[in-house]
Amino acid sequence: MILEHVLVLSAYLFSIGIYGLITSRNMVRALMCLELILNAVNINFVTFSDFFDSRQLRGDIFSIFVIAIAAAEAAIGPAILSSIFRNRKSTRINQSNLLNK
């Protein structure tokens, strides 16, 4: 596959994630957009690793590290959101002022 096509795809995914993160008012949607951003970064790591030196696995190892961080975020994020929902009865970002109490 051509490098430019993959980079355009990654930039498109990253832009969608940033747009969704900025405009979302729901915490669940913000977490999903954050996952989209992390996946765009993974695509870049693997693409540049394959394009510049396919014998070394630096980009692939970084990608596995980012996937592990995303898995931890996917496990801890909903637990925090359910706790916030239990206490505040809402998952809206603009309604939750957690530093108030």
UniProtKB/Swiss-Prot annotation:
One of its GO terms (molecular function) is oxidoreductase activity, acting on NAD(P)H, quinone or similar compound as acceptor. It is a multi-pass membrane protein. Keywords: Chloroplast, Membrane, NAD, NADP, Plastid, Plastoquinone, Quinone, Thylakoid, Translocase, Transmembrane, Transmembrane helix, Transport. One of its GO terms (cellular component) is chloroplast thylakoid membrane. It is found in: Plastid, Chloroplast thylakoid membrane. It is an enzyme of class 7 (translocase). GO terms for biological process: ATP synthesis coupled electron transport; photosynthesis, light reaction. It catalyses: a plastoquinone + NADH + (n+1) H(+)(in) = a plastoquinol + NAD(+) + n H(+)(out); a plastoquinone + NADPH + (n+1) H(+)(in) = a plastoquinol + NADP(+) + n H(+)(out). Its EC number is 7.1.1.-. The chain crosses the membrane at residues 2-22, 32-52, 61-81. It holds the Pfam family Oxidored_q2. NDH is composed of at least 16 different subunits, 5 of which are encoded in the nucleus. NCBIfam families: PRK05715.1-2, PRK05715.1-4, PRK05715.1-5. Belongs to the complex I subunit 4L family. PANTHER family: NADH-UBIQUINONE OXIDOREDUCTASE CHAIN 4L, NADH-UBIQUINONE OXIDOREDUCTASE SUBUNIT ND4L. NDH shuttles electrons from NAD(P)H:plastoquinone, via FMN and iron-sulfur (Fe-S) centers, to quinones in the photosynthetic chain and possibly in a chloroplast respiratory chain. The immediate electron acceptor for the enzyme in this species is believed to be plastoquinone. Couples the redox reaction to proton translocation, and thus conserves the redox energy in a proton gradient. This is NAD(P)H-quinone oxidoreductase subunit 4L, chloroplastic.
